[in-house]
Curated annotation (Swiss-Prot):
Binding site for Mg(2+): 460, 462, 464
Cofactors, names only: Mg(2+); Zn(2+)
Reactions performed catalytically: RNA(n) + a ribonucleoside 5'-triphosphate = RNA(n+1) + diphosphate
UniProt protein name: DNA-directed RNA polymerase subunit beta'
GO cellular component: DNA-directed RNA polymerase complex
Region (Disordered): 1392-1412
UniProt family annotation: Belongs to the RNA polymerase beta' chain family.
CDD domains listed in its UniProt record: RNAP_beta'_C, RNAP_beta'_N
Record note on quaternary structure: The RNAP catalytic core consists of 2 alpha, 1 beta, 1 beta' and 1 omega subunit. When a sigma factor is associated with the core the holoenzyme is formed, which can initiate transcription.
Taxonomic classification: Bacteria, Pseudomonadati, Pseudomonadota, Betaproteobacteria, Burkholderiales
GO biological process: DNA-templated transcription
Amino acid sequence: MKALLDLFKQVQQEEIFDAIKIGLASPDKIRSWSFGEVKKPETINYRTFKPERDGLFCAKIFGPIKDYECLCGKYKRLKHRGVICEKCGVEVTLAKVRRERMGHIELASPVAHIWFLKSLPSRLGMVLDMTLRDIERVLYFEAYVVIDPGMTPLKARQIMTEEDYYNKVEEYGDEFRAEMGAEGVRELLRSINIDEQVETLRTELKNTGSEAKIKKYAKRLKVLEAFQRSGIKPDWMILEVLPVLPPELRPLVPLDGGRFATSDLNDLYRRVINRNNRLKRLLELKAPEIIVRNEKRMLQEAVDSLLDNGRRGKAMTGANKRPLKSLADMIKGKGGRFRQNLLGKRVDYSGRSVIVVGPTLKLHQCGLPKLMALELFKPFIFNKLEVMGVATTIKAAKKEVENQTPVVWDILEEVIREHPVMLNRAPTLHRLGIQAFEPVLIEGKAIQLHPLVCAAFNADFDGDQMAVHVPLSLEAQMEARTLMLASNNVLFPANGDPSIVPSQDIVLGLYYATREAINGKGEGLSFTGVSEVIRAYENKEVELASRVNVRITEMVRNEDTSEGAPQFVPKISLYATTVGRAILSEILPPGLPFSVLNKPLKKKEISRLINTAFRKCGLRATVVFADQLMQSGFRLATRAGISICVDDMLVPTQKETIVGDAAKKVKEYDRQYMSGLVTAQERYNNVVDIWSATSEAVGKAMMEQLSTEPVIDRGGNETRQESFNSIYMMADSGARGSAVQIRQLAGMRGLMAKPDGSIIETPITANFREGLNVLQYFISTHGARKGLADTALKTANSGYLTRRLVDVTQDLVVVEDDCGTSNGVAMKALVEGGEVVEALRDRILGRVAASDVVNPETQETLYEAGALLDETAVEDIERLGIDEVRVRTALTCETRYGLCASCYGRDLGRGSLVNVGEAVGVIAAQSIGEPGTQLTMRTFHIGGAASRAAVASSVEAKSNGTVRFTASMRYVTNAKGEQIVISRSGEALITDDIGRERERHKIPYGATLLQLDGAAIKAGTQLATWDPLTRPIITEYGGTVKFENVEEGVTVAKQIDDVTGLSTLVVIDVKRRGSQAAKSVRPQVKLLDANGDEVKIPGTEHAVQIGFQVGALITVKDGQQVQVGEVLARIPTESQKTRDITGGLPRVAELFEARSPKDAGILAEVTGTVSFGKDTKGKQRLVITDLEGNQHEFLIAKEKQVLVHDGQVVNKGEMIVDGPADPHDILRLQGIEALSRYIVDEVQDVYRLQGVKINDKHIEVIVRQMLRRVQIVDNGDTRFIPGEQVERSDMLDENDRMIAEDKRPATYDNILLGITKASLSTDSFISAASFQETIRVLTEAAIMGKRDDLRGLKENVIVGRLIPAGTGLAFHKARKAKEQSDRERFDQIAAEEAFEFGTPSAPAEEPQHPAE
């Protein structure tokens, strides 16, 4: 019996493979795949529904329609398996072979494959070195191409029109050969000698000098070398045989009523066959050339449409005027094979339903409706029923289940016990979007979800749905339980904060319970323990918020760590606290002191509390604690009965007067404008400023009034306490609402924006409590609608960004423990404008030290290199005031094809060092993409008053210490004895007693220094002041002013101030005035000494020249005596172009796409001395002379702000012209560390503005992937071409090989690729093709004969293997090790056998993979 069953089963052993190769198929290969030629365009007989013979669905070619049954019905049943029927020619076998058997069409005339012709850059064009336009003219029979010029003056590959051709034939007879159509192109391809071409190209490359030629040759060389290496012949790009897809993959299904639904491919194939057959007939009839030619062209077009419809010319359309879906359309795009079927499979054993809240569940549970569970666990129930003998067959078991008999429910309970299910809420933006829970059976039809996991799922209960999936195998259940159980995922992988933080009601309840009130009932009582407090509270002797004294028992860690000693010991102390806090102390986990609860618990505090619990008490205690906090919070919020009413929105009493004052000021500005004292723009700016200040003032007054309330204390005196106003409590606790929203309810709504983003100058002075009038309502509708439109856009954009990020990092997995590198980056606290934006502890927490951390006072090593810096370590480092720590980073990790655990550091979602096999790339992408929807979509316009901060005009110290200047700080002392700064990049540091940097401030050019280097100062001391509205030009030398090229009406114009009547000279742009001679001149000042000689720069022969840029107001006169540090001219800063600052999501995308900004700042290419050369039209010439004396020139537009001056020494990579930085320049001139710092800081700025926390390491991981390719500078003896971009690990492998063979390794430059570019240029063609530009990627891969080693996650998902991450990584490693040992054993046995027989050992054949 068993043998018979096995006959039925015939399980196909699936192949085990480690790589997939793609290549061009030769005509013979196509024929070898085929099971017969399709000769007729017929599909099926419309009466009998049987396939036509030799047609597109022919059973003889493709196999039988019914299992084990031939077409005519002569042979049926299994016993005839493998017989070929002599009547109908059909093999008796399974019908599913119709999914895998291919046919072919012999083309009467060769046809070019459109992918290799039209997919840019055209591969055919590259190989033939002809333009695409010319090849197309030949292929579509518009022109001839010379194949063999013979003895004529014609050139090979020359294109000629028909007329030309006939003339030449008359002239030369048959001395030469020219052809048209694909035959001609095929001849040309066959005639190419690849090896020879490669040699010539390599020599050409060495000898040519022109950039364009180098580029062209390198491109062509790459394609030809690919052909050479892969053994693919170029003429295979021209098809002689067309393969036909198996019929089940292009089905034809009869609908009722005699109509048929068919795949578009059948139409396309029919066209090809019809035209092919017609062409065959015409050729047999020896029809006139012109007719045959037309038919060949039509055949070419038909094949084009089949392969890629619409790529050339108009798309072929079906009966309904809709373009037909070709083979290319089947695989590309969102609905194509890759993204729809290979990456997005639907799964069995799943269901979805609405979610409702389940406050009684434990954190690791979810409520599963009985009916759903019954359906999901059906097979398990069937099995149990059979085992228990309730049902004899599966059919009987099925009946039992359908009737839902009582025994079924008991069995369901049993089956479900300890069997986790996975819940998923779409969109799954990060790994916490799928978590495992233990199901609890419930009545009803909705899934119950624990409230604390809502934050991770981003779920709410307004109708959200969730999907349930059942892990089937034991391994899957185990992984779900250990890795995915909700109680094991309590931290966000993005930043390491707890994800199970209470919100809304829970927060409100806990806040209310831990507030204190003055003179509450029972204030000042003392209690002996918490149980007494609870009794008093239940008997209404005390209120929740009353201040009382209580003896509280805390469990503290035992000092005695000996064997058998308890871990925690009780400690009793008296606390002054409130009733609510004392009651809450009951749920404190052992190891946490009561002090963490002895304060009003706001949302931030609760988050910190859970974090502390996790670090001090471990995962288990924390989960229990969080659950209990939630229960208490809900209970207390219910008991508190907090509600809001209109009267809670207190409108501030001062509102009328504040608004009235503002209106008066606005009137005053209107008057000034009417009398012409201010411009329209100034008036508008001022009005907007006034109203935004007013809005703030009203809001402040409102919050002051709302936040406190009068109360009588125990002594009978009136005092104020924090308010118990419901609205204030909600906002203050962080449960709901914010100051801004309360301001709209009870203050004033303030200014509104127009559709284009500009601000309407009349504000809405009303608030929602008073109500809006029609105009106010109308003004505010715009903002509301724009918000909705923005949200929709944002979601799509954010999703696309996430997709690109995942694609670029998907193959980055932790593959080893330590790569052993000593490199790292120096981490400092992030300081902006003297404020610490991000403390050092946050930046190094969870990283591995790259060098020893040394105590600056005692010089002893605190932490050795290679130590993981945890909370205690960073606290030590902070306490000792160490201000810089070198840590390992993903950027400098030397692991190839992955990362090592030490360079990555702590896995933030688990709180310990990352495990080998963790897919850190995907986690990084999710962490950056997930908050994307919270970012704004807007571009900020600076100018107008949108978000103008007051312009800074001084800096002051924030802490006590000593002033220190950086090396680049230079200043001169002027006649008044003031120190004037003349450096552009000088900074002042404040250091503490041991000399550690506490803060750092940029001091701009032209500032007056109030404190000098080494001065001891107190916090709040001003360090420097400057005029914020103008930028001065200052002389560093004294002397007599001598103007050069200052001609009124040519380079300067006289401006007379309307109000004061004084005149000043303004430098104007020369090109506005006609005189040609004045083009190269630039107004400047030279200084003369007492003898009338030009003052020289000390130590050189250069005369001092101080140039004025366009727009400068010259404040000195010709011949005037000036002192050192005196101002020669001022440039009003208002006249500088207002820069748009790209914010939000577009900015993040711009950084990761590594786009060069327009008007980028210019960085110095070398270290050297600056001088100014001769100006050209509209440009100024800046020259840097390096230390060897070579000159490097930069041409800079006149209106740009140059940050350096004559004679200044600049360092390589220093900014010399103002503007946004170009990341490519930073990488080239300052290196990887500077680049990473730039991208990390810029991305963090955007997220920080929205209050989103992301750990730096995620951004570093992305930057590592952006840097994964290098450009070859000198190829040494390697197989690369200079200028080629290759994968870094490839190049390092190749260089290792060269060094081992004593050959010259290649040298290279780092290059930065944007994430889209990096994803497409990955080594894996499967991953690239499934990302974007599918056709182009596949075309290129096919020509190169590329091999995909299946290293990344995506490729493995697509081919259906376990992914090489997590447990899958271990699986693949073990499998490879086993294969290796099998191979060695096989060799050993073969050798032993050979030895025994005493024969000379024959070479052992390579074993095929042993069936596993």
